[in-house]
From Swiss-Prot:
All copies of domain SH3, residue ranges: 1-58, 168-227
One Pfam family per UniProt: SH3_1
Protein name: Growth factor receptor-bound protein 2-A
Source species: Xenopus laevis (African clawed frog)
One GO CC term, this protein: nucleoplasm
SMART domains found in the cross-reference section: SH2, SH3
Domain notes for this protein: The two SH3 domains and the SH2 domain are necessary for the reinitiation of oocyte meiosis.
Swiss-Prot/TrEMBL keywords: Cytoplasm, Developmental protein, Endosome, Golgi apparatus, Meiosis, Nucleus, Repeat, SH2 domain, SH3 domain
Family note: Belongs to the GRB2/sem-5/DRK family.
PANTHER family per UniProt: PROTEIN ENHANCER OF SEVENLESS 2B
Length: 229
């Protein structure tokens, strides 16, 4: 994932990474420490303070969502190529690409070379973002023509009335109750917190960002707000 530096940071230890405000960093690991991430910039990697950066939210990144949950969500999509990227369950620190095709969901391991570049087959990329953009027009599969397309925001139906999906760019909700994550990939928050919604295609669980963390949360714990942030 990518992050934008909010402030300058000068390394004070050999394993830290210096950067300037506005730099775009590649976050390699969000689990090293609750206050520090491991990141890469200009071919160098090291630890950075998490409160100095702002994660770039992407509707296709679902973090530690289980493979079965990915298949359930993508199975509801109408179009081939609907996809998400998640952290690998079998190989911590790696990523998997899950894509709907026909009645199935295919899974691709995102590989990395010694220089830290990402790839599925031959063409390599500096970030997951670049990999995703490339495979919107170049098939992710060698056997079928599968082009990535964003998950569709499906309006939900309640009691016979069709409720319009929340507006995009961006949508915020406010927490009605505290929520403590019970599984990997869930987003914790406190009552009153504002959460940016990045995916609301599932009727029960939405994906959002709060305090630079991204994950899934129960829809009935929040209420929509009109807020420009």
């Amino acid at each position: 994932m990518e992050a934008i530096a909010k402030y300058d940071f000068k390394a004070t230890a050999d394993d830290e990474l210096s950067f300037k405000r506005g730099d775009v960093l590649k976050v390699l690991n969000e689990e090293c420490d609750q206050n520090w991430y491991k990141a890469e910039l200009n071919g160098k990697d090291g630890f950075i303070p998490k409160n100095y950066i702002e994660m770039k939210a992407h509707p296709w990144f679902f973090g530690k969502i289980p493979r079965a949950k990915a298949e359930e969500m993508l199975g509801k999509q109408r179009h081939d190529g609907a996809f998400l990227i998640r952290e690998s369950e079998s190989a911590p620190g790696d990523f998997s690409l899950s894509v709907k095709f026909g009645n199935d969901v295919q899974h691709f391991k995102v590989l990395r070379d010694g220089a830290g570049k990402y790839f599925l087959w031959v063409v390599k990329f500096n970030s997951l973002n670049e990999l995703v953009d490339y495979h919107r027009s170049t098939s992710v599969s060698r056997n079928q023509q599968i082009f990535l397309r964003d998950i569709e925001q499906v309006p939900q139906v309640h009691g016979g009335d069709r409720a319009t999906s929340l507006p995009q760019q961006p949508t915020y909700v406010q927490a009605l109750f505290d929520f403590d994550p019970q599984e990997d990939g869930e987003l914790g928050f406190r009552r009153g917190d504002f959460i940016q919604v990045v995916d609301n295609s599932d009727p029960n669980w939405w994906k959002g960002t709060c305090l630079s963390q991204t994950g899934m949360f129960p829809r009935n714990y929040v209420t929509p707000v009109n807020r420009n942030m």
